[in-house]
Amino acid sequence: MPLPPDRVDYSPIIDRPIIKWPNDARVALWISPNVEHYEYMPDDDSARTPWPRTPFPDVQQYSYRDYGNRVGFWRMLESLDRYNIRCCVSLNMAVLEHFPEIRDAMVQRDYDYMSHGIYNTRYLYTYTEEQEREFYRDTIDTLKLHTGKQLKGMLGPAISGTERTPDLMAEAGLIYHTDWMHDDQPVPIKVKSGKLVSVPYSIELNDSSLLRDNHYEGDYFARICKAQFDQLYKEGAESGRVMCIALHPFLIGQPHRIKYLDDILSHIMSHDGVWQTTADDIADYYIENYYDDAVAHAAKLS
């Protein structure tokens, strides 16, 4: 019987078809800054409140995150630019209209973008089916208007979704979803029409979960990012792996932390066999070269 949820087949990594990245790279590395905007007075949502500490407005928490767009983003860019990193931004689309300077800096660097919703204070799980359809139309149109780019993927706003989300994403023309943090390689996701894959994101190599939620120091973040890379680099000699580092400008962009991002990137980018890329390009390459084989292989196991 299929394992719930019946969206992905179980296929152990030890006997899958081998993946070869471009130029025989061992690791496809993508960096995902979460460039977000939180509403000062968000709509009341009985399922979840973005500011549980006090009644709205919570100036402390709002302004803490706003630091990222005012200061941290720019400090983070300096580090990323030193290593010629081309990012795939997890983007609250409202940023494109609220902060044109940030928009222009990202466009100038030819970054790719995945939707992270409109605001990080609006969640998908309260949406009706038609509201969710309109949400995808809105995010696709907004990105195209401001960057000229076609939206290809999504990390749900605050990693939220509905049971319909994969089907509606594919229906709208999206090809990848990063909410599924279940693998070190892309994996096909079953949808009613089209093709959709999970591209490995990370809650482990994520400054939000480590530095904010669990209060680890920046040197620990650097240490585990380098250790993760070293292990994936070793395994990638046999079959390509994906590594994502998830950043939040209001966290990694703090003065006392930014040196650790330099430490991480210096270590990784000193290696040959690293495909520094974006989630868009990983999804495109995987679907073109490995999607059909992966589906056929999983079918034999089920």
What are these model-predicted stretches?
Residues 2-197, 222-245, 251-302:
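Catalytic alpha-helical scaffold of carbohydrate-active enzymes acting on polysaccharides/glycoconjugates
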Residues 186, 198-220, 240:
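Positively charged, amphipathic and often flexible ligand-engagement surfaces
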